[in-house]
Each structure stands twice: as structure tokens, then as C-alpha cells.
Amino acid sequence: MRSVIADSRRLVVKVGSSLVTNDGRGLDHAAIGRWAGQIAALRAQGKEVVLVSSGAIAEGMQRLGWTRRPREIDELQAAAAVGQMGLAQVYESRFAEHSIQTAQILLTHADLADRERYLNARSTLLTLLRLGVVPIINENDTVVTDEIKFGDNDTLGALVANLIEGDALVILTDQQGLFTADPRKDPAATLVQQADAGAPELEAMAGGAGSSLGRGGMLTKILAAKRAAHSGANTVIASGREVDVLSRLASGEAIGTQLIARTARMAARKQWMADHLQVRGHVVIDDGAVEKLTEGGKSLLPIGIVGVQGAFARGEVIACLSAAGREVARGLTNYSSAETKLIQRRPSGEIESVLGYMLEPELIHRDNLVLV
């Protein structure tokens, strides 16, 4: 089996906290130097690389003299702010040894949820790659609370892969890859060398939590691979402890777990909608509407809606749930939540008589709807 990285031109590489820190006692300058060297080698092969790096909070803890990761959000944000200084400095100096310029980019999920900011971020990243710069990306933990508590850089790596239409996402961790079961508990567990991204059985295999320094367990990596597949990006989950792992993957050596994107690449606009991590609201739809959306490729009409959850405005991304609560699709709504409550279960011909106007006959047009 040949590594998919060998034939990939544009890569997103995510490096976890444990691979760039001294067990939480600040940044490991030597390790970061090795990553810079391997990425420089990939660049020499004509590959474009965007690096998503953890480590800011761990570095901030070291600089502030903290031995335990704080639980308070404001202290986590303070550590991130202090640590980002050191993280940027080390990467800049190590890549400079290879005559490579770096750029620091701090993103939040909100940046990628807003269409205009999303396109601006994409334009900036593509320009940096064209100029031969290696972008170093991290979540902007200093100003965001939800991401510190629940977010992870695996997901961010997948979002960036979709943003720049990367060929592959490489998630480097302190584990060998995905196993059929937890190898710490099951001696019969074997490494999954290759599977389809998004295969349902993968989520059942992926268990366990991340280390005390990082936030992402194996499940987040599996879900990240599923998300990256939206843009056709394959994913490799491999151990960053393997010597020259990036160089070996680029040479075609199969290391870790390969998750292949089998689904057709989404159109850019639909991909952006699918990548929304936090939708504004939900509509519950009946079984007939579920069938029309999933099998018929139809638009969502008001008559198929049986419930409205949350508050949303026209033009915002909302999720469509089945009666069982499973997300079926998401898309841009033509009506606000207040308007939707008035027209639900009604045929489109009655919209004007209920509201006094009709913007569109559909709640979500099929061109603005994506299955998930």
C-alpha cells in the first residue's frame, strides 16, 4: 500500500501538543526544529504545506510558572496569549534556518462561519502559499471561549484543508493510528491501515480521551477526516514519534492509518455550509421531507416542517433534523425562525396569506442545501 501523501501537492499538517512540548514544560525547540526540517524537505519536493500547531497554552503555562493546566477560561486565555508569542518565535527561527518565511494566523470557527471572512481567509492563505510562505495556524484561544472548552486543532486542520482545497490532511499524534479497539485494554487490537473516511464503524473503534495537555482524542481525528473528505482531502493519522515521519510519508511509505475520501467533492458554497460547527437554529422535518431531501434532491418546503428550534434570521445556516433528532441536512434559510413558525405545515401557496408576502416558495432551496 502506497501513502496518499506521495501524490499530494497541497498538505495541511496538524501537530499535537505532545509533539512540540517537553511534556507540558514549555516548547521543545529541538522537536520544532525537526518539524521545520521535514516540512522544508516537503517544500523542496514542490509540495505546499500549511501547519496547524498546538502548544500555545503549554508554552504559556511554562512562562507563567504554572504546573497544572488551569480550568478557568480567563486563565486559559491568558496562557494562550503569552504562549503564542513563544510559539511564533520558535517556528520563525527554526524555519529561517531553511530560508523559509512563516506567517502566524489565528482563526476562530466564527471566522470560517462568516462567508466574507471565510473567503478573505482563503485568499490570504492561498497568497501566502503562492509566495512560498509556510502559514502557522492555531485557534485564537485568547478571544474565544467555546473552542478552549470543546474545540480541537484536529477539527481546525480539517476546516483549513477544506478552506484551501488541500489534497491531504496529516494528523500527527502520540498514537500509531486508529486501532480496531483500545490497544491498552484489548491485546487483540490491530492497526487499521486504510479505510474510507466517514465509515460508520470507525467511530465505534475510536475511543479514549486526549492527554492532559491536548484536547483531541481519536474520535475527534476520525470526525476531522470525515469533514476533510468534503473537499476530497484524504487523511493520514500517524505517530509523530516515528523518525522522519513526514519525509517517509512523502516518499510513499504507508505509516499509520489512511482514511480515503470516497465521496464526490462538494461545491465550494455547499462545503462552506457543511463546515459550520455551530448553526443558528434547527427545523424538525417529517419523514416525507427527509426522503425528498436525501433521495430526491428536492428543496425543503414549509409543509414538511413540524418544529422550529432556536432563533435565526433570513440567510443564516440552519440544520434540518429528522423526527429522531438526526441531522439530515443544512442550508441557508429564506425565512427567519419567527416566520418559519407561522408557515410550518402549510403549503407554499399559503405563505403570502399568512405572512402578507412571499419571499420564496421554499424554506431552503436545493442549491443552498447540503446533505450531512
Swiss-Prot record:
Residues bound to substrate: 54, 141, 153
SUPFAM superfamilies membership: Carbamate kinase-like, PUA domain-like
UniProt pathway: Amino-acid biosynthesis; L-proline biosynthesis; L-glutamate 5-semialdehyde from L-glutamate: step 1/2
Catalyzed reactions per annotation: L-glutamate + ATP = L-glutamyl 5-phosphate + ADP
Ranges of residues in domain PUA: 280-358
Example GO biological process: L-proline biosynthetic process
An annotated Gene Ontology molecular function: ATP binding
EC numbers for this chain: 2.7.2.11
UniProt-listed Pfam families: AA_kinase, PUA
Protein's cellular compartments: Cytoplasm
Keywords: Amino-acid biosynthesis, ATP-binding, Cytoplasm, Kinase, Nucleotide-binding, Proline biosynthesis, Transferase
UniProt xrefs under InterPro entries: AceGlu_kinase-like_sf, Asp/Glu/Uridylate_kinase, G5K_ProB, Glu/AcGlu_kinase, Glu_5kinase, Glu_5kinase/COase_Synthase, Glutamate_5-kinase_CS, PUA
Binding positions (ATP): 14, 173-174
GO cellular component: cytosol
Top-level enzyme category: transferase
Function: Catalyzes the transfer of a phosphate group to glutamate to form L-glutamate 5-phosphate.
Family: Belongs to the glutamate 5-kinase family.
Descriptive protein name: Glutamate 5-kinase
Organism: Paraburkholderia xenovorans (strain LB400)
